[in-house]
């Protein structure tokens, strides 16, 4: 009997380039066991709430899946024996979640803004471009 689950796993930040291959491996495991993936989100590198193995960032991946217990056990086992996976969490859900998560929605909204370094550079240029204030009435402002 298939049940719905939400799975989040954190990958070591040095292994971020391996994440697409890991996702493909887990997808084939789920779909090979007649499971369904309702939502798959790669959140990228994010700040951790507390250090894990002296790391402050990790690569987050979210899956909403519908699988039976045998496939779920195999998936959890593969998380456990993969040294790159720092943490994993499996939550049983009542039904499928297919809409975009809040984290991805906020990420999309932030995506419209320029990068922080780009904003800083632009702000610095605006300050440099502003004409210097000149004393028009002839007396010094120091006397005030």
Curated annotation (Swiss-Prot):
It holds the Pfam family Ribosomal_S6. One of its GO terms (cellular component) is cytosolic small ribosomal subunit. Residues 105-124 have a biased composition (Basic and acidic residues). One of its GO terms (biological process) is translation. It comes from the Bacteria. GO terms for molecular function: small ribosomal subunit rRNA binding; structural constituent of ribosome. Residues 97-144 are annotated as: Disordered. Belongs to the bacterial ribosomal protein bS6 family. Binds together with bS18 to 16S ribosomal RNA. This is Small ribosomal subunit protein bS6. It comes from Xanthomonas campestris pv. campestris (strain B100).
């Amino acid at each position: 009997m298939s049940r719905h689950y939400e799975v989040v796993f954190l990958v070591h930040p040095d292994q971020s380039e391996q994440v697409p291959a890991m996702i493909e491996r887990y997808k084939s495991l789920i779909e090979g066991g007649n499971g369904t993936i309702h939502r798959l989100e790669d959140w990228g590198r994010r700040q951790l709430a507390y250090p894990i193995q002296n790391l402050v960032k990790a690569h987050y991946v979210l899956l909403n899946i519908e699988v039976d217990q045998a496939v779920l056990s195999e998936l959890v086992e593969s998380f456990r024996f993969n040294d790159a996976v720092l943490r994993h969490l499996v939550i049983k859900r009542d039904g499928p979640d297919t809409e975009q998560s809040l984290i991805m929605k906020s990420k999309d909204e932030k995506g419209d803004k320029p990068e922080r370094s780009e904003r800083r550079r632009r702000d610095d240029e605006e300050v440099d471009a502003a004409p210097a204030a000149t004393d028009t009435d002839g007396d010094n402002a120091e006397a005030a």
